[in-house]
C-alpha cells in the first residue's frame, strides 16, 4: 500500500460531517438498464430485524441505481438469505435510469416498497411531497444503535427520519498503478499544484494520457463532472464557501464556483484525457478502469466504489505485482485535507410490517458485514467496491486498503457530503448534470453553465 496513504489514514483528527441539507451521490453501475438477481448467499448471523415474525411469503421490491453485477448479487444474496428466516421474498432491481424511473413509478402510483436514494436531496423532495413514509420508533432505535448522528442527518427531513444509510462512499481518491509511475519516474503528488504539474509533465512526455475520464451514465450523465467540481470548491474556496454554495447562500454564478468549474475543464483537455468512447461525454463512467490497467492513462479520480468496476482479476495495493492498482488522496490546495463523501439511503414507500422489517435489517451492522462478505465473493476476492460506516462491524471483513478508507472517513477534519446530492433534485440531479455536460462538450462557457444552473434553483 502507498506509504503516503497510510500516513494520511493514521492522522487522528475529529470527524466533522456538516449538514447543509440532506444528500448523497453514487451511480456505481455496469452496462445494461435494469438487472435483478435472486438472493441466496451468506445470511450472516442471527437476524435482529423481524425477530420470530412470519410474513407469509410476501414479496418486498427494492430499486436503486447500483446495477453492477457484484452489487446486485450482494444486495440480493444478503437480503434474500436473511428474508428466508422471516418467510419473506426480497427482490432488488438495479436501474440505469433510476432517477427518471422512480419519478414515473411514483407518479403512476406503483412505486417499489423500498428504494435506494443516491441523492438525499431527492429523498427530501419525496418526503415533503408525502411519497415516502417516516421511520417508526423501533426502526429509528436500530438506526440510532448503528449509525452516528452525522450519517443519520442526511436521511432526516425537517426533523423527521425517513432514510437509512445503506452505503458510504469516499470520493476524494485517485486510482493509479504504482509500477507505471515508478517506471516513468513520477511521484505521487501531495498538493494540487504538484498534481497539475504532474498532469502537464505526463502530457509533455507523450506516453499514456494523464487521466482517464468519462461522464456518460444514462439519465445521470454528468454526475462525475459534479464530483470534480465539488472537490475543487472544497479545495480552492474552502468548507465554509462549500456549505453556503450547497444551500444557495452563495449562488452558482459566484466567481469562486465558476473558478472551480473552469479548473476542471482546463484539466480535461484532449492532450490530458483518454476517453475510450471517443469523447468524455460519450465515455461511460464505468469504462475507465480497463484503460488504466492497460496503460492507456496514468490516473483516474473516482470514489472507493470504483474498485468493483476494475477488470476481473485486478490486484490492489500489492507491491509485488507490477500491474497492481492503488490509490492516493486527491491532493488539496491549502493543506487542510478535505474529503468529499457520499452514500445511499434506503427509504420506504409504505409502512407495512414486512417493509419495515426489511428497513430495520438494512440499518444493522449485520447487513453491512454480510453485504461486504457477499460482494467481496462476487468480485472474486478483491476489493469489493462497497463500504459502510455502520458502527459495530467486524473490521476484518474489509481488506487493508478498504479499512484505510474507513479510517479516512472517520478521521477527516473537513468532510463534506456530495454537494449536488444535497441540492434540490432539479438542480443537483438536473441542470448541474446537463449544463456540466454541455460545458464539457465545449458548447457553453463555465459562466454560461453557472448562470443557467443558478436560474433553475427553485424559488
Model-derived segments and spans:
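Extracytoplasmic/periplasmic substrate-recognition and gating elements
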Residues: 80, 184, 313-381
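Short, solvent-exposed loop/beta-turn-alpha elements that line the ligand-binding surface or hinge
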Residues: 136-149, 215, 219, 223, ...
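A structural signal for short loop-to-beta-strand junctions that line the ligand-binding cleft
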Residues: 104-105, 112-113, 143-179, 209, ...
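C-terminal capping/gating helix-and-loop segments adjacent to ligand/active sites or protein-protein/ligand interfaces
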Residues: 381, 399-457
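Glycine-centered hinge/linker elements that transmit conformational signals in sensory
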Residues: 199, 246-278
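Hinge/lid segment of periplasmic solute-binding proteins
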Residues: 49-54, 120-172, 224, 324-326
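Conserved N-terminal structural module of periplasmic/extracytoplasmic solute-binding proteins
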Residues: 23-124, 129, 141-143, 334, ...
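Extracytoplasmic/periplasmic solute-binding protein
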Residues: 162-166, 196-250
